[in-house]
């Protein structure tokens, strides 16, 4: 037992023996909105995690709140550690997942109590960033801000784009991915992630986990397919959800090797998705009405090669950075590369940022980040704050309300976009604006977390 929470409830670590009970709990409590039945794929995924199939998660990375008298689970969450990249720099991340509480126990602080423990675990592991894919607003209560993009790719009705006729000759074809494809896939995936600010690297071991490690029916399992030429030469790969998703055949990945047109394999992929969606309809998944690329993300080279006209609104991932100075120090190499490529190359000076409660100070010498450090805010400055130029160095150069500075640092919004959305996002000088724009431009990210 980690804590006695009172009221007949205790907080403890999960164990492998909890696999079946927690699988049933998560499938029931984390079902889709207004769904009449549990969402079984979340139960399968939970069982995979607690039975040791995941490459980094162990059962005692989970928390359970249970009734001390009956052992009935009433609340739970898990921590899945992994390594992501920010501008090519590795960063340790703790992803919080499968957060659920029985309705009769909600509003009693059980999630907050678990976060206190989980955040401590994550910090001890050296995780500088925590993320959650979660319901709207809720996790803002625990120090999280929506600051990484999620989804937003196009969709089209089956009648809008007609696929090639069955049996029509095509210059590319789709086949299952095999283990011997993985060196090619790793190289192509690494290349594709250069388009992105924040991404999740995978070596051959982790790609093999994605290919073979998930139990069929798991909510995190994808169907992975290779694209190849008529002569059998590898041309790229795709991924898709192995079921109809809101009536859609849902593409998640589309990558082609350098030197090939992004448009070239699309007719074969379109035909494959149409046939696959029909097979899912025939097995009882429901109506097959459209093909969607929401999970491919808001920005992708395919969208410049194939004309799509309709999109679902993107969502976002929550992010938490408890020690911003440490995080900025870790991503220092990426910041220095950006500065070197900007009009402020070789810059020397200081940038101070504030969220009106705390601050951080970045010092640069000849373009090198030398001193990222917490920067306590002065409480005795003279007069009101209007964000105007000042001779008082205790006034921060950039002020972002609340946790919106995470949107800036993680490339979710540019400084101009933040100022448009938040009137109290203030920049004191032109030099500060130029430096922030050089260090923290808006940049695309695509998060396929290791789950």
Which residues are covered by each model-predicted region?
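Glycine-rich phosphate/pyrophosphate-binding loop shared by adenosine-nucleotide-utilizing enzymes
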Residues: 70-76, 94, 232-237
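Conserved acetyl-CoA-binding loop-helix of GNAT-fold acetyltransferases
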Residues: 96-101, 107-120, 261-277
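PAS-family sensory domains and close relatives that share small-molecule sensor folds
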Residues: 82-83
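Intrinsically disordered, low-complexity, positively biased terminal segments
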Residues: 1-20, 24-40, 44-47, 66, ...
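Conserved active-site alpha-helix within GNAT-family acetyltransferase domains
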Residues: 124-128, 133-153, 296-315
